[in-house]
């Protein structure tokens, strides 16, 4: 997820078994939610793959994102990923935004209301170029899941 971590714990079972469980959990969560892994579900969706069936982790973060988006009156918006990348803060290539037309074209790709999670577990985006970025929520979700695991 584009970051490092340090976990300290005490356990009555061997540390290597706990570490294997942590590694497995992080693998699953990264495979679902990391924009820094090209083969993660969210990266595939961001490239326009509408056939990806998301797992329960993606669904949980999607639902929380919707809740926060509504509570904030739209100020929290996971579709700002294209802007995040354009200004050099994300995993994708930096784009120099030189004109207001370029900025306007990216702004058209924002708006959480343009993204839907279908009952079949696939994600529908009004425009295939919409870039979803859950990083504001995903890291906290990972910590919560780690707490459940431990």
Enumerate the language-model features and the residues they cover.
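A contiguous, well-ordered beta/alpha segment that forms the leading edge of an enzyme domain
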Residues: 1-135, 148
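Cysteine-centered nucleophilic/redox motifs
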Residues: 136-150
């Amino acid at each position: 997820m584009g970051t490092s971590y340090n976990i300290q714990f005490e356990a009555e079972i061997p540390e290597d078994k706990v570490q294997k469980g942590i590694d497995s959990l992080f693998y699953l969560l990264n495979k679902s939610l990391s924009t820094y892994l090209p083969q993660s579900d969210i990266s595939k969706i961001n490239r326009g793959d509408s056939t990806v069936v998301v797992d329960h982790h993606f669904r949980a973060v999607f639902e929380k994102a919707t809740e926060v988006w509504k509570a904030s009156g739209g100020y929290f918006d996971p579709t700002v990923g294209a802007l995040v990348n354009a200004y050099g803060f994300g995993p994708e290539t930096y784009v120099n935004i030189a004109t207001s037309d370029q900025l306007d074209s990216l702004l058209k790709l924002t708006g959480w209301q343009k993204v839907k999670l279908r009952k079949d577990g696939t994600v529908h985006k009004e425009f295939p170029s919409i870039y979803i970025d859950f990083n504001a929520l995903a890291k906290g979700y990972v910590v919560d899941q780690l707490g459940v695991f431990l």
